């Protein structure tokens, strides 16, 4: 505690010296650096509002100084860290417009990209990038990936309805996009959460157009369950058969065989029922309840 108190007093004394230097020698080549260091001392004390005020003071007094680039970039970064995205955007835009081609402008553009991804406003970033000076490139493949990443982040934050809209927008904007299968899979999950059977059938169907994709097994589980619940037993039987072929675990295979047995029985397909019951009874981990069910059929 004493060490922290000593450090705090040292920072206060340092700022007093810097203020005295700037006040007494405003035309000194060291004055602009003193103002910058004053701002940095506030940053180190986690006093972002005072730091921003100091950096803005520097920019107003020494707008053409090379140190101004660093101060302008600091302002954007501090707003960004505080979650003041709209103010950060404006600050970073000033950096890019005033110092095109600089390292600060390049870093500002990277932070702007992150901000727009966090806000799920990639179209706005694309328009901004096109309008900014400095030969900034933002090609279609990057817009594709960022649009998907933004939607995925929204889903991860539990904003399901917004994520649903964002994934649908991604699929409409990039019908051949690199993350199309991922988007369809997330829409299946959202459909399951919202008990939207039509949505699950639509997007699981899209996934199964590419049967060897990494989501096909999960898609078949959801699709078969929906078809069974909707009493589309013949369709469910076909889905459970596909699931059995793709099952990567014994539990999934057991689920598929149980589904096949029940569907075959309900559509009165005796041959399929016998085959399904025989396969189910051969399973090593069969529960007594399922064993009795297979024998009954």
Q: Residue spans of the language-model regions?
A:
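Single conserved hydrophobic/aromatic residue that forms the stacking wall/gate
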Residues: 2-13
